[in-house]
A protein has these predicted regions:
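A short, basic/flexible loop-to-alpha-helix module at the beginning of a structural domain
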Residues: 72-82
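Short helix-loop-beta connector
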Residues: 80-85, 178-181
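Conserved beta-strand elements of the Class I
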Residues: 86-90, 185
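Ferredoxin-reductase
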Residues: 1-65, 152-153
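Histidine-anchored nucleotide/phosphate-binding helix
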Residues: 98-110
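Short, conserved phosphate/pyrophosphate- and ester-handling motifs at nucleotide-, phospho-/glycolipid
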Residues: 7, 95, 189
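Reductase modules of NAD(P)H-dependent flavoproteins
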Residues: 117-219
Length: 219
């Protein structure tokens, strides 16, 4: 069985063309409420890297094909001992993957503690907003959850009122990070993670309030 905490990742093991062994890490996007048994599917998101070895691996994989993986690993998870008033979830690209798996836990936190949640998701265009339908649907059902797509290039023809034109690090300031209430999660592009971490520190948040995971695309 694969029993994981939302926010954790697995590692896929494979070899380069010359036989050298390597691995890639992928956060689990699966929404689950039990340990996953044989035959049950898990969801991961794989970035397309032109010429990338992992990209070639998955492109050549047939339905029903097998890969070798290990895990789960990682501590980029919601802490049951948190007593904050608001979560700031910030992501670019496939960095939004762990937040999808966290949705049931966030729903519980909102119901039990009245916590507020803001999700800032960065992408270049609407078509690159991974899992956006899930987040919009969740926002409609949970008034304490605000979903803010941040699009750096192309805007939709009829943008939702919460759509921001620009980068997530630019949109962050509008939500006035508050060290008295906030815990922030940063996941995705390393430059974004660093920029947002510095902005949060400048706002007064301490290191324990800033939880981060950087995604680096490799060939």
């Amino acid at each position: 069985p694969l029993d994981f905490q939302p926010g954790q990742f697995i590692q896929v093991h494979f070899s380069y063309a010359d036989g050298t062994e390597t691995k890639r890490s992928y956060s689990l996007a699966t929404i689950h409420d039990h340990a996953l048994g044989p035959g049950e599917a898990v969801d991961i998101a794989v970035s397309f890297v032109p010429g990338g070895a992992a990209t070639a691996l998955f492109e050549a994989l047939d339905i029903g094909g097998q890969v070798s993986a290990s895990g789960p690993y990682g501590r980029f998870c919601l802490n049951p001992g948190d007593h904050n008033g608001r979560y700031l979830l910030i992501a670019t690209g496939t960095g939004v993957t762990p937040y999808r798996s966290m949705l049931p836990l966030l729903a519980t936190a909102m119901a039990e503690r009245g916590v507020q949640v803001v999700l800032l998701q960065g992408a270049r265009s609407p078509g690159e907003l991974l899992y956006s339908e899930d987040f919009y649907s969740f926002a409609e059902k949970h008034p304490n959850f605000r979903y803010v797509p941040c699009l750096s290039r192309e805007l939709p023809a009829e943008p939702h009122p919460d759509v921001h034109h620009g980068y997530v690090q630019q949109a962050l300031a509008a939500f006035t990070p508050d060290p008295a209430t906030d815990i922030a999660y940063l996941c995705g592009n390393p430059d974004m993670v660093d920029a947002c971490a510095e902005a949060l520190k400048a706002a007064g948040l301490g290191n324990p309030q800033i939880r981060r995971e950087k995604y680096v695309s490799s060939k």
